[in-house]
């Protein structure tokens, strides 16, 4: 963002409120292209190569200067195509660049907030595993959890209204409304469930929609974080990290006074000394030590909160109250639950010996094997029962390429699921991928698996399926006992910024 600021000539004054003229500047598109934000858009169009991408930008800007195209497109969109025959292409380019421009004031506020608060910005907070620090909390003493499905805005204007507090340029907001009403994918985005919506974000990579949805979540979470800090005896010191993940900081300070006046008389209803909250995709989990009555109050509070302040109608059935002792938390490929671990203590008093049985609550996080096998079966690595099969479409690749592909998939899955308390699921995945790789190579060489392994040796595949213990032995070469002990525990990596398709099997 420093590079953007130097090119744009923006300082901490009010200059960044006037964003609309930036759409007509060629260097904005060049910067977006260099940062890889619209690279696929500019280069995937048939008939254009890398050298002519700037020509596309020039042609687009020239068409925008001809105001008749925009006016006629709004008044009579059925007769006059928007920006010529390549309506979808040019509209997508402009929407991507517009999202970058609208992020400028938010990013500048982020920088000023970090400097004012003295917070060191870390790129590791972008890691998906930074969410899983939620599982390191002491859940064994909690009683209930709320599984919350965050509703989507029913009207597009709600998203635009949320940005009015940040962006003062009315022309940019009008252009945003134009893009939202022109896009045909938005209707399917807000009417589908969270699973389809999240997959739509990942596959279509619409930066503008992701930006708008993130701002919507920021509005919701800013108010909730304020109430959480007011109602909890244990003040949260890491709640800012939740907002930092989506690059919205100053909203907490801005909403503190507003929500203090609105909820000061009602906070006594929600006094809860132990609260644990996490959001992932379009869902969130709230854990508490409170009673069922308190959780039911939180449930109806969320419904009224969304309705009153965000004009979102949500049914109470979208929020589920579950008792943690007989319920499992499923999110992002992990399953967590509280189990009773029996323990026996032998006590001796004089000549009499006693054996005391005691059950200790233990919070375990595992990887369910059946959904993972389903993902492998969907990708044609095994059948529905988990029996490995060869990858026929890879049989034309070279041997090293085939082995590298299988090894990379296993390392990604092992890396992502390293937070599991038990490694049996990963051993099963390793078995499936190794045998599938062997059958693919045997199919290529028109041989059997046994004959192929006898000819080349099983060591050919072993080196590409690196165990976590071997990784730690390379990291700590002089302390082998520590590496073996760490490899058996839950490990969260801070370099995972996207979910592998096989890992996202919900």
Curated annotation (Swiss-Prot):
GO biological process terms on file: mRNA processing; RNA splicing; tRNA processing
GO cellular component: a single term: chloroplast
Chain segments annotated as coiled-coil in the UniProt record: none
Keywords associated with the record: Chloroplast, mRNA processing, Plastid, RNA-binding, tRNA processing
Alphabetized GO MF terms: RNA binding
Localization, UniProt: Plastid, Chloroplast
Signal peptide feature range: none
Principal location listed in the UniProt entry: plastid
Family: Belongs to the intron maturase 2 family. MatK subfamily.
HAMAP family the UniProt entry points to: MatK
PANTHER family: MATURASE K
Function: Usually encoded in the trnK tRNA gene intron. Probably assists in splicing its own and other chloroplast group II introns.
Protein known as: Maturase K
UniProt source species: Lactuca sativa
Lineage, opening ranks: Eukaryota, Viridiplantae, Streptophyta, Embryophyta, Tracheophyta
């Amino acid at each position: 963002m420093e590079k953007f600021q130097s090119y744009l000539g923006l300082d901490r004054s009010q200059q960044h409120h006037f964003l609309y003229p930036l759409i007509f500047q060629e260097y904005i598109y060049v910067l977006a292209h260099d940062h890889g934000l619209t690279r696929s858009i500019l280069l995937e169009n048939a008939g254009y190569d890398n050298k002519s991408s700037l020509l596309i930008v020039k042609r687009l800007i020239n068409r925008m200067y001809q105001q008749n195209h925009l006016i006629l497109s709004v008044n009579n969109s059925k007769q006059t195509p928007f920006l010529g025959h390549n309506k979808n292409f040019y509209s997508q380019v402009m929407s991507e660049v517009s999202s970058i421009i609208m992020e400028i004031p938010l990013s500048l506020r982020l920088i000023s907030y970090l400097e004012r608060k003295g917070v060191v910005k870390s790129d590791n907070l972008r890691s998906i595993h930074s969410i899983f620090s939620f599982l390191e909390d002491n859940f064994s003493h909690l009683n209930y959890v709320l599984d919350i499905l965050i509703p989507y805005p029913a009207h597009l204007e709600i998203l635009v209204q949320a940005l009015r507090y940040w962006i003062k340029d009315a022309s940019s907001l009008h252009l945003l409304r134009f893009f939202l009403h022109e896009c045909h994918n938005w209707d399917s985005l807000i009417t589908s469930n969270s699973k389809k919506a999240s997959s739509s974000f990942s596959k279509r990579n619409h930066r503008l929609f992701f930006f708008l949805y993130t701002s919507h979540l920021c509005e919701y979470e800013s108010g909730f974080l304020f109430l959480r800090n007011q109602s909890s005896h244990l003040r949260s010191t890491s709640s800012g990290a939740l907002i930092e993940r989506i690059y919205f900081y100053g909203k907490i300070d801005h909403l503190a006074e507003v929500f203090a006046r609105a909820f000061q008389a009602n906070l006594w209803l929600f006094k809860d000394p132990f609260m644990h909250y996490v959001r992932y995709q379009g869902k969130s989990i709230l854990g508490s030590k409170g009673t069922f009555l308190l959780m039911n109050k939180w449930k109806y509070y969320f419904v009224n909160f969304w309705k009153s302040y965000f004009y979102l109608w949500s049914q109470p059935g979208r929020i589920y109250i579950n008792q943690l002792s007989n319920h499992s938390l499923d999110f992002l490929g992990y399953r967590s639950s509280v189990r009773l671990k029996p323990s026996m203590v032998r006590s001796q008093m004089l000549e009499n010996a006693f054996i005391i049985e005691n059950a200790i609550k233990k919070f375990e996080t595992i990887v369910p094997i059946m959904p993972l096998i389903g993902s492998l079966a969907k990708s044609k690595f095994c059948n529905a029962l988990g029996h490995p099969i060869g990858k026929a479409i890879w049989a034309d690749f070279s041997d090293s390429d085939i082995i590298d592909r299988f090894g990379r998939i296993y390392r990604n899955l092992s890396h992502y699921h390293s937070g599991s308390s038990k490694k049996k699921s990963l051993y099963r995945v390793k078995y499936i991928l190794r045998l599938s790789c062997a059958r693919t190579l045997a199919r290529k060489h028109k041989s059997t698996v046994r004959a192929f392994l006898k000819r080349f040796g099983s060591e050919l595949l072993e080196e590409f399926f690196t165990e976590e213990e071997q990784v730690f032995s390379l990291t700590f070469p002089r302390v082998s006992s520590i590496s073996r002990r760490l490899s058996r525990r839950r490990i969260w990596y801070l370099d995972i910024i996207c979910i592998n398709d096989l890992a996202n099997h919900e």
